[in-house]
């Protein structure tokens, strides 16, 4: 069951939205408002959430409020990875939530929180437990990022290698399961907090790991799952067949479905982070996906 629609992913991060083109996020704001209206036209009861921000910046939320975006939404979301990428300590999580609560009355979801096992699995094990202690009861949705390590043969793209929130080598070690599917120490730690903690797991186009992921999600008792449908993937041959397969596999979970990423051919710049040439096309994608999977 789709329980919420999320509009974009990390819109204040250059790895996901090219704000060198859209310097004040005016294009993004107009696109997000159109997307929210399109989703509501297909399912007026479906909550709409602003894509999780990284870094956690109250100024960005205020910008979205001033541009009328938040008036169209039911929640905002944040992402935090303080043991890997952020410029603050893990113990500052409550302060970071308070910073956002100071500029909006909307509920604040934590749509990605994670710790890598790059340095040591014990660090990730600690990170799961400490994150749960700090966050449970402070947010209506908490999605741990992620279940699966990224295969090292896949790219983890970044626009600024050392910038806060960027994806670099640690990104390959964020899972509770290793690339070969074997569990890490943190898996047992996570199981103590499921189903209060959900999972964020992205699936690549025709991802061979889908069935393995569903098996482990069920074994862990996960109820709340965040994933995405990429507008860029939607332009591929057989896209709907893949989307249908993915969504059928996830029917047993309460899914927050993220709509994001521009087909390179439809961007101002030929890249999935680019603002679209025609923002209405993204809204149309959101409407089609809502109609197909969440109406």
Which residue stretches match the model-derived regions?
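A generic structural signal for ordered secondary structure
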Residues: 110, 131, 141, 218, ...
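Residue-level marker for beta-strand->alpha-helix junctions and adjacent short loops that shape enzyme
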Residues: 12, 55, 83, 115-116, ...
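Residues that form or flank phosphate/diphosphate-binding pockets in enzymes
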Residues: 59, 208, 238
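Aromatic-rich peripheral "rim/lid" segments of glycoside hydrolase catalytic domains that contact
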Residues: 23, 120-126, 137-139, 143-216, ...
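Noncatalytic carbohydrate-binding groove/subsite architecture in carbohydrate-active enzymes
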Residues: 2-3, 22-132, 137-138, 155, ...
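Cell-envelope and extracellular/periplasmic
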Residues: 10, 20, 80-81, 113-114, ...
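Hydrophobic faces of well-ordered beta-strands that scaffold small-molecule active sites
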Residues: 3-7, 48-51, 74-78, 108-111, ...
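Substrate-binding cleft and catalytic face of glycoside hydrolase catalytic domains
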Residues: 1-56, 214-295
């Amino acid at each position: 069951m789709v329980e919420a629609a999320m509009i974009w992913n990390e819109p204040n991060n250059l790895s996901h939205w090219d704000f060198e083109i859209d310097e004040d996020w005016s294009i993004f704001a107009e696109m997000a408002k159109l997307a929210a209206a399109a989703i509501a036209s297909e399912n007026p009861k479906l909550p709409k959430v602003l894509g999780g921000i990284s870094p956690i910046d109250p100024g960005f939320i205020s910008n979205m409020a001033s541009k009328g975006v938040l008036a169209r939404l039911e929640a905002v979301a944040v992402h935090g990875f303080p043991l890997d990428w952020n410029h603050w300590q893990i113990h500052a999580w409550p302060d970071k939530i308070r910073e956002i609560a100071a500029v909006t009355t909307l509920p604040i979801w934590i749509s990605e929180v994670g710790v890598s096992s790059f340095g040591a699995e014990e660090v990730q094990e600690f990170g799961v437990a400490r994150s749960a202690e700090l966050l449970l009861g402070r947010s209506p949705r908490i999605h741990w990022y992620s279940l699966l390590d990224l295969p090292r043969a896949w790219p983890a793209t970044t626009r600024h290698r050392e910038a806060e929130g960027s994806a670099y080598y640690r990104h390959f070690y964020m899972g509770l399961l290793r690339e070969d599917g074997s569990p890490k120490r943190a898996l047992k730690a996570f199981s103590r907090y499921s189903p209060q903690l959900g999972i964020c797991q992205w699936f690549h186009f025709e991802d061979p790991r889908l069935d393995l992921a569903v098996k482990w999600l069920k074994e862990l008792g996960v109820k709340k799952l965040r994933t995405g449908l990429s507008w860029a993937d939607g332009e591929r041959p057989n896209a709907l067949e893949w989307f249908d397969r993915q969504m059928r596999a996830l029917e047993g979970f309460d899914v927050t479905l993220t709509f994001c990423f521009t087909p390179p051919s439809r961007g101002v710049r030929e890249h999935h982070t680019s603002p679209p040439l025609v923002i209405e096309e993204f809204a149309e994608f959101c409407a089609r996906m809502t109609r197909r999977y969440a109406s």
